[in-house]
UniProtKB/Swiss-Prot annotation:
Protein name as annotated: NACHT, LRR and PYD domains-containing protein 2
UniProt-reported outcome of changing residue 616 to V: In OZEMA18; uncertain significance
Induction remark: By interferons and bacterial lipopolysaccharides (LPS).
Gene: NLRP2
GO molecular function per UniProt: ATP binding; Pyrin domain binding
Positions bearing Phosphoserine: 671
Pfam families in the cross-refs: LRR_6, NACHT, NLRC4_HD2, NOD2_WH, PYRIN
Lineage: superkingdom: Eukaryota
Location in the cell: Cytoplasm
Family note: Belongs to the NLRP family.
Organism: Homo sapiens (Human)
Gene3D superfamilies xrefs: Death Domain, Fas (1.10.533.10), P-loop containing nucleotide triphosphate hydrolases (3.40.50.300), Ribonuclease Inhibitor (3.80.10.10)
Disulphide bond pairs: none
Domains as described in the record: When isolated, the NACHT domain is involved in interaction with CARD8. This interaction is not detected for the full-length protein, maybe due to autoinhibition, this inhibition might by relieved by an inducible change in protein folding. The pyrin domain is necessary and sufficient for suppression of NFKB1 activation induced by TNF and for inducing IL1B secretion in collaboration with caspase-1. It is involved in interaction with PYCARD.
């Protein structure tokens, strides 16, 4: 053996630092390592009596120096003498590396430049693995760690299996806390993976399985558990080989061959590479953290290669494997965050996608019970987390559950109130951070370093800190020791030399901390911080689109602007918040101030303001809103309720309550499920009550629209109480597609006798219990409704009869919209009877898509003769045809008829119908506006209409002919008519094939004409220079004429509908 002088560090000097008790413990621990079988030959009495110097002589005489060094380092760590371990590592680094490289060849062509030399920490981890896998021969029994193989020496496959098993057992230590619930979760998802499910038989084709989900939910744990199952021969589908490829580690490699990529950690298998790869059907590849590969756009599909000996960039090699150009028969399992799914969809052939959702609610509850031990404390803490929907959602990540439990348990033990801690995620994370260090620790520099690392990583879209990154930023690994001990950082157990944050959400919190802390003077001169910008850049809409991980950091930035939290941080770390942070946040680039916003922008802003818990800040921001549109789920209702009640200038509010995430939405028959839904409801009701209180407190709030929403009985009750109150001043109310069915009925009753409501739309109710409630509203003597929209509702003939009678009684309604209802013959006749009633004051009526036929038009024509008030009628999307038009024209000819606007959009009208309309328009008719859009009137129909336009008695002011199949040669007739017409103000020729010649003819006519036309709509070729020049000439000579070149599509809202309903 070797002398002590040949060791890489002075072990004797280190042992002299130990007390007598510590030296005895060192002796005991070092003799427990089975690898040093030579130690077994040494009498224990010699070891027991030896002092430090004698012990070193014994060890170095009988054992290999590499073993003595690694074992000693491990013993020092077990004794918690990290000072001695670190000191030894500094001395042994170079010597140990040389020693290790003599014993282990370099990996398959990966040079030192391509792969950095192993550090002593990495050597120590490998030593632990090798120590467990060490083989000892005794007769015909071979021992491999704790495994026993009878009859023969283990082959390379068995040895590799055991090393992998040892490696992946470490996964249960990769996050703080117990692992029982993690294992339960892993077993649950394993049944969804074909090659780990006993019910799925092996098929002729290999599987590609993609596990996807947000960060920290257990994708890597599940992948590593699969590897462990393979190593222990517990995988249902038997693979001879399995390889674990960590993209976190691979992202640091330069170009290499596929063989070098896969076998870089298995140099002992390099002679068998061709044999192994030839058995692709028996190989499982686990590609973990695909989103961490950091490949440039297009890199994965560029230069795809099937040659496993050819050097290529790592993304190309993985892309070739996923695309099944490389080893097409191998089985693949990939884990990724959702952001990389697009690339996978392009690459992978018919993958099976499995969404990993982490801890279910029962998992979280079980975890809390095990962590606390005391059931009362556990359930109190669990309910506190559950009361904050955003925090509860984060709790699907095991690490977040551990943070919550650790923080709240400590507070309860101290007798502190944990309720404020769970109010916001910022409050919880700050309390957790401060609880890991004593107050007054003055760790200002260390915290700023950590927050800088978090920000750098978040901008790079990684939670991993590589040793090279630390060196580039001037950070020593020893600087991270405090945060490793505090469980804020974790050392990666697969990719050595890497560190990661406990969870992405905590990294986002630390990033926000970097931007909100007051800068030190030396930082202003430090160039390496500028590449991640300031708060303005962090909250930039453009940057958040590029990197969605920044969004939550923006939330936490607002949360850290809270003065109480700033004091807590200063007391612990000696750090101060920037005094200008609030003003910087107010200047941020969230583009939804003043009401001009997308729903996503607005929800982000409300979430940010809620995190701040600063009412003055909220009031200042929300005062700018006059209109607001909220999409609410269990998470968003909390910040929305907190902020909207401070919208003192709000005039209009739109709500969409998402069914999937709010209370009472989960269908279940079991009684415990009913209880659970009731508990959900109780958590959410206070916030909903706060939100609805604005209807009674804000006298300027006049408009409410609730669309596509699920409202439980409790939510409806609270809403009804608020809108029925005397202090509610709503004028326009819209309820569209609200479930369950009885919600419409209850909301209608809440409006009964409401004096200020003048506009009401009810849409999408398929139950018949709403009509009696609506009739009550209409009959009430204090009803002031002027507009009623009853759209797409189901009703019986008797209910249409009741509604017709209510319309006769009502004295306020002037406009009724019955679109998309099946009136049929009986319903139509009942309505016509009402329209004939002398006390019916309806002026505008829409019967769009009510399944009316030409026969209904005969009765309707009679109504037009006797009705004293009806001025607007819409019959769009009813197949009345030419015969129906003929009947209508008979009624319109009577001088008693008051109708001014008639909409016949898409009514199966042809040129024959235009002939009857032409005869009507040539007489002195009351009709001023006519919409014939989407009817095939063609050349002949257009000729008839132009004939009418030429007549001096034609009073038509608006003519809409969108999509009427008008060809270019009809433009000659039209130009002639426009030249002499003195009444037409609006003409719509959109979506007609007028051609360049027809449009040119129209433009030339308009250039010379001094007629009454003020709005012309048509489609032109944007690239026709001649037409564009004529258009400019018209605009110059006739600035009052507006020419709409149809940049938008009118299907969503017809032009005629603008003037139809109030």
């Amino acid at each position: 053996m070797v002398s002590s002088a040949q060791m890489g560090f002075n072990l004797q000097a280190l042992l002299e630092q130990l007390s007598q008790d510590e030296l005895s413990k060192f002796k005991y621990l070092i003799t427990t390592f089975s690898l040093a079988h030579e130690l077994q030959k040494i009498p224990h009495k010699e070891v027991d009596k030896a002092d430090g110097k004698q012990l070193v002589e014994i060890l170095t005489t009988h054992c290999d120096s590499y073993w003595v060094e690694m074992a000693s380092l491990q013993v020092f760590e077990k004794m918690h003498r990290m000072d001695l371990s670190e000191r030894a590592k500094d001395e042994v680094r170079e010597a140990a590396l040389k020693s290790f490289n003599k014993r282990k060849p370099l990996s398959l062509g990966i040079t030192r430049k391509e792969r950095p030399p192993l550090d002593v920490d990495e050597m120590l981890e490998r030593f632990k693995t090798e120590a467990q896998a060490f083989t000892e021969t005794k007769g015909n029994v071979i021992c491999l760690g704790k495994e026993v193989f009878k009859g023969k020496k283990p082959d390379k496959d068995n040895r590799c299996r055991y090393i992998l098993k040892t490696k992946f057992r470490e996964m249960w230590k990769s996050w703080p806390g117990d692992s029982k619930e993690v294992q339960v979760m892993a077993e649950r998802y394993k049944m969804l993976i074909p090659f780990s499910n006993p019910r799925v038989l092996p098929g002729p084709f290999s599987y590609t399985v993609v596990l996807y989900g947000p960060a920290g939910l257990g994708k890597t744990t599940l992948a590593q558990k699969l590897m462990l199952d393979w190593a222990e021969d517990n995988l249902i589908h038997k693979f001879k080989y399995a390889f674990y490829l960590s993209c976190r580690e691979l992202s640091r490699l330069g170009p290499c061959s596929f063989a070098e990529l896969v076998f870089r950690d298995w140099p002992e298998l390099q002679d068998d590479i061709p044999h192994i790869l030839a058995q692709a059907r028996k190989i499982l590849f686990v590609i973990d953290g695909f989103d961490e590969l950091g490949a440039a756009p297009g890199a994965l599909i560029e230069d795809i290669c099937g040659d496993w000996e050819k050097k290529k960039p790592v993304p190309v090699l993985l892309g070739s494997l996923l695309n099944r150009v490389m080893l097409p028969k191998a089985a693949l399992l990939v884990t990724t965050r959702p952001r990389a799914l697009r690339d996978l969809r392009i690459l992978a052939e018919e993958p099976i996608y499995i969404r990993v959702e982490g801890f279910l609610e029962e998992d979280r509850r079980a975890y809390f019970l095990r962590h606390f031990g005391d059931e009362d404390q556990a359930m109190r803490a669990f309910e506190l987390m559950r009361s904050n929907a955003a925090l509860f959602q984060l709790g699907s990540a095991p690490a977040v559950c551990w943070i919550v439990c650790t923080t709240l348990k400590l507070q309860m033990e101290k007798g502190e109130d944990p309720v404020p801690t769970c109010l916001t995620r910022t409050g919880l994370f700050l309390r957790f951070l401060c609880s890991r260090f004593p107050q007054g620790a003055q760790l200002r520099g260390a915290l700023r370093t950590l927050s800088l690392l978090a920000a750098q990583g978040l901008w790079a879209q990684t939670s991993v800190l590589h040793r090279e990154d630390l060196e580039r930023l001037g950070v020593q690994e020893s600087d991270l020791r405090l945060f490793l001990d505090g469980d804020i950082l974790r050392q990666d157990r697969v990719s050595k030399g890497c560190y990661s944050f406990i969870h992405l959400s905590f990294q986002q919190f630390l990033t926000a901390l970097f931007y909100t802390l007051e800068k030190e003077e030396e930082e202003d001169r430090d160039g390496h911080t500028w590449d991640i910008g300031d708060v303005q850049k962090l909250l930039s809409g453009v940057e958040r689109l590029r990197n969605p991980d920044l969004i939550q950091a923006g939330y936490y930035s607002f949360g850290l602007a809270n003065e109480k939290r700033a004091k807590e941080l200063e007391a612990t770390f000696g750090c101060r918040m920037s005094p200008d942070i609030k003003q910087e946040l107010l200047r941020c680039d969230i583009s939804c101030k003043g009401g001009h916003s997308t729903v996503t922008d607005l929800q982000e802003l409300l979430g940010c303001l809620y995190e701040s818990q600063e009412e003055e800040l909220v009031k200042e921001v929300m005062a700018q809103f006059k209109e607001i549109s909220l999409h609410l789920n269990a998470v968003d209702v909390v910040p929305s309720s907190f902020c909207v009640k401070h919208c003192r200038n709000l005039q209009k509010m739109s709500l969409q309550v998402i069914k999937e995430n709010l209370p009472e939405n989960v269908t279940a028959s079991e009684s415990d499920a009913e209880v659970e839904r009731s508990q959900d409801d109780q958590h959410m009701l206070p916030f909903w009550t706060d939100l609805c209180s604005i209807f009674g407190s804000n006298k300027d709030l006049m408009g409410l629209a609730i669309n596509d929403s699920f409202l439980s009985a409790s939510l409806v009750r609270i809403l009804c109480e608020q809108i029925a109150s005397d202090t509610c001043h709503l004028q326009r109310v819209v309820f569209k597609n609200i479930s369950p069915a009885d919600a419409h009925r209850n909301l209608c009753l809440a409006l009964r006798g409401h004096k200020t409501v003048t506009y009401l739309t009810l849409q999408g109710n398929d139950q018949d219990d709403m009509f009696p409630a609506l009739c009550e509203v209409l009959r009430h003597p204090e009803c002031n409704l002027r507009y009623l929209g009853l759209v797409s509702c189901s009703a019986t003939t008797q209910q249409w009869a009741d509604l017709s009678l209510a319309l006769e009684v009502n004295q306020s309604l002037t406009c009724v919209n019955l679109s998309d209802n099946e009136l049929l013959d009986e319903g139509a006749k009942l309505l016509y009877t009402t329209l004939r009633h002398p006390k019916c004051f309806l002026q505008r009526l829409s019967l769009e898509n009510c399944h009316l036929t030409e026969a209904n038009c005969k009765d309707l024509a009679a109504v037009l003769v006797v009705s004293r008030e009806l001025t607007h009628l819409c019959l769009a999307k009813n197949p009345i045809g030419n015969t129906g038009v003929k009947f209508l024209c008979e009624g319109l000819r009577y001088p008693e008829c008051k109708l001014q606007t008639l909409v016949l959009w898409n009514c199966d009208i042809t040129s024959d119908g235009c002939c009857d309309l032409t005869k009507l328009l040539q007489e002195k008719s009351s009709l001023l506006c006519l919409d014939l859009g989407l009817n095939h009137i063609g050349v002949k129909g257009m000729k008839f209409l132009c004939e009418a336009l030429r007549k001096p008695l034609c009073n038509l002011r608006c003519l809409w002919l969108w999509g009427c199949s008008i060809p270019p040669f009809s433009c000659e007739d039209l130009c002639s008519a426009l030249s002499c017409n003195q009444s037409l103000v609006t003409l719509d020729l959109g979506q007609n094939p007028l051609g360049s010649s027809g449009v040119k003819m129209l433009f030339e006519t308009l250039t010379c004409s001094s007629g009454t036309l003020r709005t012309l709509r048509l489609k032109i070729d944007d690239f026709n220079d001649e037409l564009n020049k004529l258009l400019e000439e018209i605009e110059e000579k006739n600035p009052q004429l507006i020419i709409d070149t149809e940049k938008h599509h009118p299907w969503a809202e017809r032009p005629s509908s603008h003037d139809f309903m109030i």
